Regions:
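Beta-sandwich interaction modules
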Residues: 1-4, 11-16, 22-24, 38-135
Length: 136
């Protein structure tokens, strides 16, 4: 049983996969019901090797920017290009050492957990689940 799950994920995805479900994390309870976290670029899924430029047009997000972990240093922040010492341009904002993304999913604390699965749903997308933390 848990009230919330936290996930550390790393993904390789591309701009052509923007605003569609790239993958799903599913948690199933013993009674058969499920909780689903849809992974959508750029709302909560950001490529491992890049940062995104949110300009309100091509890249507009519905959700607040997720927390990210710089894998080279272990620093945690809601990074943006300015913090990373990058300038905004039409070129990708590449990240030295890469960054993983932290996400959370509220759960029903009275139900017993049965399984967790990660499924990619878009072409040319790789998503890795690096860690899971359950909160009672």
């Amino acid at each position: 049983k848990a009230s919330k799950a936290y996930f550390l994920i790393a993904a390789s995805t591309y701009y052509m996969q923007s605003h569609i479900v790239n993958g799903e994390i599913k948690i199933e309870y013993t009674d058969g019901q499920k909780e689903v976290l849809k992974l959508i670029l750029p709302d909560n899924l950001i490529p491992l090797d890049q940062d995104i430029f949110v300009d309100g047009y091509a890249f507009n997000t519905k959700d607040p920017r997720p927390w990210r972990v710089r894998l080279k240093t272990g620093d945690v922040s809601k990074y943006h290009a300015g913090e990373l010492g990058k300038t905004i341009s039409n070129n990708p904002i590449s990240i030295d050492g890469g960054m993983a993304t932290m996400l959370d999913l509220p759960l029903n604390p009275v139900k017993e957990l049965k399984s967790l699965s990660l499924e990619t749903t878009a072409n040319e997308v790789v998503i890795g689940l690096m860690g899971v933390t359950l909160v009672k």
